[in-house]
């Protein structure tokens, strides 16, 4: 049995997919797409090593300890080159995680022809008339190249050392004078590029699990600046001490959303030792945090917030706070509830030394079946 390692490319920005969620984090059942695709291929062969390129290593590591992860580059070629640094097997198989449903039959065709060339690649024939600059091309000479592809590791490394931009391994090796061997591709190995492609693939739908997160934050009064809650000015001078603008509600809500998604906490994302967050707009930071949560495949169901303050009174501001949260997070206002309470003059809140906020949120997986 030949010694083969597997590289799965999962660091792309999903620009052409044109949704808030990156396609590699679409949920198939409970698995993100990148994991589903990697599990599928890894079940076909005892790979020496499995390497996944990533733009979010710490989060992806939460799903499995069976693979190695490496930060991707700005391009496919850069990501692959970095991953190859971890590979020392004679052969390497490379695939895009966006090719989710590669079959065992296609995989076997690649393995069976391993000794035929320097790179073995699947390809589809073109059935339709094909034009280039309004001129018909000879479709018999056209191939639609797919992945996974198997290459001789040393030759692929050498090809990528040219620092040219190749869109797949076979063209990189061909540019070095290497021999390419084509096997029959398959429709199921088509790349998921546009959201419309989801309708062409028979994929498991997202599970209906709900993920709950809580956030709690406290700040002391003392700054001669506006008191902001959810970006709404409550008082012109009763500001809270903080590195940012002191919006304790936004901080609490940010923590709740990050926690529900398993993405850490506000201090990790926006450390108070970083001067770029000095006096930062906390509602903008909240939006950025939720964008990160959506990128990895979640969306909000509802928000419930309890503001604890002896003073000032907040009754007249609750509606404005709910509206501003809804606008910031692109969420229906009926899914947001803001409550206010005192501590009956007990503790630091009762002594009007500061205020606290407790936020609870529920998330679900992004439902890509609605696209």
Curated annotation (Swiss-Prot):
Q: Which residues bind 4-CDP-2-C-methyl-D-erythritol 2-phosphate?
A: 217-219, 243-244, 265-267, 270-274, 341-344, 348, 351
> Pathway involvement?
Isoprenoid biosynthesis; isopentenyl diphosphate biosynthesis via DXP pathway; isopentenyl diphosphate from 1-deoxy-D-xylulose 5-phosphate: step 2/6; Isoprenoid biosynthesis; isopentenyl diphosphate biosynthesis via DXP pathway; isopentenyl diphosphate from 1-deoxy-D-xylulose 5-phosphate: step 4/6
- Region (2-C-methyl-D-erythritol 2,4-cyclodiphosphate synthase) location: 211-371
Task: Spell out the residues of the site Positions MEP for the nucleophilic attack.
Answer: 139, 191
Pfam families assigned to the protein according to its UniProt record, in alphabetical order = IspD, YgbB
Binding, a divalent metal cation? 217, 219, 251
Indicate yes or no for the key word Metal-binding. yes
According to the UniProt entry, what is the EC number of this protein? Answer: 2.7.7.60, 4.6.1.12
GO MF entries: 2-C-methyl-D-erythritol 2,4-cyclodiphosphate synthase activity; 2-C-methyl-D-erythritol 4-phosphate cytidylyltransferase activity; metal ion binding
Residue spans making up a coiled coil are none
Q: Which reaction does it catalyse?
A: 2-C-methyl-D-erythritol 4-phosphate + CTP + H(+) = 4-CDP-2-C-methyl-D-erythritol + diphosphate; 4-CDP-2-C-methyl-D-erythritol 2-phosphate = 2-C-methyl-D-erythritol 2,4-cyclic diphosphate + CMP
Keyword Nucleotide-binding annotated: no
Gene3D superfamilies referenced in this protein's UniProt entry, alphabetically: 2-C-methyl-D-erythritol 2,4-cyclodiphosphate synthase, Spore Coat Polysaccharide Biosynthesis Protein SpsA, Chain A
What cofactor does this one take? Answer: a divalent metal cation
Site description Transition state stabilizer, residues in chain:
16, 23, 243, 342
Keywords, comma-separated and alphabetical: Isoprene biosynthesis, Lyase, Metal-binding, Multifunctional enzyme, Nucleotidyltransferase, Transferase
| Start and end residues of each stretch annotated as 2-C-methyl-D-erythritol 4-phosphate cytidylyltransferase | 1-210
The processes (GO biological process) annotated in the record are: isopentenyl diphosphate biosynthetic process, methylerythritol 4-phosphate pathway; terpenoid biosynthetic process
Under PANTHER family, the record lists:
2-C-METHYL-D-ERYTHRITOL 2,4-CYCLODIPHOSPHATE SYNTHASE, CHLOROPLASTIC
Q: What does this protein do?
A: Bifunctional enzyme that catalyzes the formation of 4-diphosphocytidyl-2-C-methyl-D-erythritol from CTP and 2-C-methyl-D-erythritol 4-phosphate (MEP) (IspD), and catalyzes the conversion of 4-diphosphocytidyl-2-C-methyl-D-erythritol 2-phosphate (CDP-ME2P) to 2-C-methyl-D-erythritol 2,4-cyclodiphosphate (ME-CPP) with a corresponding release of cytidine 5-monophosphate (CMP) (IspF).
Q: Which HAMAP family does the record cross-reference, listed alphabetically?
A: IspDF (MF_01520), IspF (MF_00107)
Please give the family membership noted in the entry.
In the N-terminal section; belongs to the IspD/TarI cytidylyltransferase family. IspD subfamily. In the C-terminal section; belongs to the IspF family.
Its protein name is: Bifunctional enzyme IspD/IspF
Please report the organism this UniProt entry assigns to the protein.
Answer: Campylobacter jejuni subsp. jejuni serotype O:23/36 (strain 81-176)
The taxonomy runs: Bacteria, Pseudomonadati, Campylobacterota, Epsilonproteobacteria, Campylobacterales
Q: Which gene encodes it?
A: ispDF
């Amino acid at each position: 049995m030949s010694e083969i390692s597997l590289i799965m490319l999962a660091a792309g920005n999903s620009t052409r997919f044109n949704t808030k969620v990156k396609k590699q984090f679409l949920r198939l059942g409970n698995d993100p797409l990148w994991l589903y695709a990697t599990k599928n291929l890894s079940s076909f062969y005892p790979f020496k090593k499995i390497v996944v390129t990533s733009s979010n290593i710490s989060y992806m590591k939460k799903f499995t300890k069976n693979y190695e992860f490496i930060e991707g580059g700005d391009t496919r070629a850069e990501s692959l080159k970095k991953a190859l640094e971890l590979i020392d097997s004679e052969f390497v198989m490379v695939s895009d995680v966006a090719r989710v449903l590669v079959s065992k039959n296609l995989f076997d065709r690649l393995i069976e022809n391993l000794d035929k060339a320097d790179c073995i690649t699947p390809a589809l024939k073109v059935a339709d008339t094909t034009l280039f600059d309004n001129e018909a091309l000879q479709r018999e000479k056209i191939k639609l190249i797919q992945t996974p592809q198997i290459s001789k590791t040393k030759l692929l490394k050498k090809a990528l050392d040219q620092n040219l931009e190749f869109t797949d391994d076979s063209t990189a090796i061909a540019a070095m004078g290497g021999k390419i061997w084509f096997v029959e591709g398959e429709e199921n190995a088509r790349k998921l590029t546009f959201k419309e492609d989801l309708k062409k693939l028979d994929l498991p739908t997202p599970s209906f699990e709900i993920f709950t997160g809580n956030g709690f934050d406290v700040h002391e009064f003392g700054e001669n600046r506006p008191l902001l809650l959810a970006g709404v000015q409550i008082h012109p001078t009763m500001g809270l001490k903080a590195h940012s603008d002191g919006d304790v509600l936004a901080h609490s809500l940010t923590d709740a959303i990050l926690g529900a998604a398993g993405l850490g906490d506000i201090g990790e994302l926006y450390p108070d030792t970083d001067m770029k967050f000095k006096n930062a707009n906390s509602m903008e930071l909240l939006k950025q945090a939720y964008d990160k949560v959506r990128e990895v495949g979640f969306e909000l169901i509802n928000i419930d917030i309890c503001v604890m303050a002896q003073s000032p009174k907040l009754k007249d501001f609750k509606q404005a706070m709910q509206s501003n949260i809804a606008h910031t997070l692109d969420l229906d206002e009926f899914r947001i509830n803001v409550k206010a309470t005192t501590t009956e003059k007990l503790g630091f809140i009762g002594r009007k030394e500061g205020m606290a906020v407790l936020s609870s949120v529920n998330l679900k997986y992004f439902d890509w079946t609605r696209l």
